Amino acid sequence: MQDLFSVAGKVALVTGGTRGIGLMIARGFAEAGAKVYVASRKQEACDATAAELSKRGTCIGFAADLGGEAGCRALAAKLAEAEPRLHVLVNNAGANWGAPLEEHPDAALDKLWNLNVKGPFHLTRALLPRLEAAVRPGDPARVINVGSIDGLHVPSLETWGYAPTKAALHHLTRMLARHLARRGITVNAIAPGPFESKMMAETLRRFGDSIRAGCPLGRIGEPEDMAGIAIYLASRAGAYVTGAVIPVDGGISTTL
């Protein structure tokens, strides 16, 4: 049983891994003994994160623009040069945008669909050879998509691109899970509620007290909460789970 939740020796790629949810997951993997690659748009941020996490484990950073297929293919090529196999892919890179309905720019919709939905699609497809190479009997390769509870319910804020793209990512997760199972790859999604991050900073500043009051567990998510669910899905403990969309929100989704 001591190895049930182990990810030691596994190779993981976490996109958007230099801050927020992605950094929480990357740090958890590194501290648990995985070899972690983080990807973000700026090489400086990747280098800083790699230096920090390498104090706890092994971490390498790659700059990547995942808002288009070419950037996803380029990242996959970098990873392929470095590793013969990839055990865990975490599609976390994403963006948000809020504006009144009458003012929401079309360019913002394009950006969010490209990064939040098409990015995970293109990157997963490009990395299939490395994921398949990691498959072992009883130990599938894992894809973990980071969605949102805003993709499970209708949010009160006018995030006209964000919430629909996260709902789409959840359904993409289910489709990939069905079709990749025969190739030894599980695909699941985490749907975070409120966590401390740059994306959530303004919302928590303005509404943090009311969010806590409305949360059945009475608090904001902590890094260990996010690392824990990712390690579960990436370990032997989660090997029989695929196609799941798991809220990690302190119970908020039960109240909506």
Predicted regions and their residues:
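Conserved glycine-rich cofactor-binding loop
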Residues: 11, 18-19
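Short C-terminal tail/terminal secondary-structure segment
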Residues: 2-4, 153, 231, 242-256
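Residue(s) in the substrate-gating loop at a strand-loop-helix junction
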Residues: 148
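Substrate-binding pocket helix/loop in short-chain dehydrogenase/reductase
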Residues: 100-101, 105-113, 211
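Alpha-helical segment proximal to the catalytic Tyr-Lys
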Residues: 129, 178-179, 239
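Active-site helix of classical SDR
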Residues: 124, 165, 173
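Short, small/polar-rich loop/turn modules that mediate ligand/substrate recognition or access, typified
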Residues: 181, 186, 241-243
